[in-house]
Amino acid sequence: QISTSTWPMSGDEIQRALSQAKISNNAQQKVIDSIQNALKVDNQTAKLDLFAETDQKNIPQAFGDHTKAQYVGSLELNAGGENWDGKLRVNAEKDPQIDNGQDVNVEGSYIAGKLWNQWLIAGQMPTYWGPGHDGSLIRGDASRPVYGFTAQRAEQKAFDTKWLSWVGPWQYQAFAGQLDDYEAIPDAKILGFRLTAQPLPYLELGASRILQWGGEGRPESWDSLWNAIKGNDNFNDGDDDKSNQIAGFDGRLNLQPLLDVPVSLYGQYVGEDEAGLLPSKKMYLAGADFSSSYKNMPYQLYAEWADTRTNGDAKGISYSHYIYQDGYYQHGFPLGHAMGGDGEMISVGGDIRFDVMNRLSGRVMYAKVNQSAAHFGDDQINKAFPEDDKIKALDLTWTHYLKPTLPLKINGWVSDSDRQGNDAGASIGIEIPLDRDIFGF
């Protein structure tokens, strides 16, 4: 079993899991074929991505939705070997939903090297920490990616020594980067560490921690960083309080090995501060998913609940800080859950693979966003949802492979907002490999 709660994932681990997969029916083979198709598309030497939508989609973003503008054209080049990998992705955007002041960017680009089962990566890649389908409380991908460095294991193998083998397959991810256009504290840094382990075949546990630290006018000495890492800076004094910190735990329980039921239960909680060495001022997420097949068509269903209020109350604390006054956001869009702080969301969704060339996914949701909007007045830090609002939405995506390496995605949505009224729209995206075979040469 492979852990999918820490993104980006290592290609080494994906290939290892595929090579060890025990396929017992056609539905499972379809899942494997779909994954291999997706890998082929992602690793094309050169490709052109085109995206357009009729209107900006003002609902909490789904996991993996990396398009941040209404019209996007991207040229991508990929290269690599056994111990190195690189991607250059140049994106041209028009009518951005997340305005970073640039019409052209290199989001999604990176260069990486591997040594002793460790990848060291420099670039601007989407990151996601947690078991949720529709959001992570601590590190989501609803904002533009943060520039920085990432380190993680190539393969999630267990320790060889008998003293630590009980930990099971494990992974870590360490990140250090700098926030872009963070006006409250220019050049503010973000540092994070996540650790996951599977001590039992049916149980995965994770722990994550994030620090906002440094920046213009703030201490950036090794001593101040060490105090922040130790947690010795939780004071209401700007001279002593060196960082804004968020930390928490998550877990996933797979009931298939225990009860022969294809259901998993998962949960996550994080806190804005600590009390008694554990996170306090907590936010919560919980869900369940079910996997099966219908007439050899594999499908998955899930239900998820998230609450980014503070211990169930909207107090203007979640994802905010009195020194880092732009909060836990970049360009005003959340670095944590897609709805931002002081929100509640219930979603039900899933996907079905009709065959190796066709997949349908979708979700329905109800969200109460930015319930502390009155607290911030004219100084809203949540630009994704700057008003106290209630949103109901249906979001559907059909993915059709015109050829095994030529995916076409068509998305449609309808929504109803107390503030903005009814809305509907559609988008289309296509990834075109730039090789001779696709054009019939």
Regions found by a protein language model. Give the residues of each.
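N-terminal periplasmic/intermembrane-space "pro-region" immediately following the signal or transit peptide
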Residues: Q1-D65
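Short loop/turn motifs that connect adjacent beta-strands in outer-membrane beta-barrel proteins
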Residues: S3-W7, N25-N26, S34-A46, G80-G86, ...
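Transmembrane beta-strand segments of Gram-negative outer membrane beta-barrel proteins
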Residues: Q36-A92, L120, W170-A174
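Transmembrane beta-strands of outer-membrane beta-barrel pores
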Residues: A52-N58, G81-N83, A92-P96, L115-N117, ...
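Extracellular loop and loop/strand-boundary signature of outer-membrane beta-barrel proteins
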Residues: P60-F63, E93-Q97, D134-R139, L179-D181, ...
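Well-ordered mid-protein domain cores that form the structural environment of catalytic cofactors
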Residues: K68-W166
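Signature for the C-terminal beta-barrel architecture of outer-membrane proteins
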Residues: G148-Q325, G341, I346-V348, R353, ...
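Outer-membrane beta-barrel "beta-signal"
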Residues: L195, H400, N422-F441
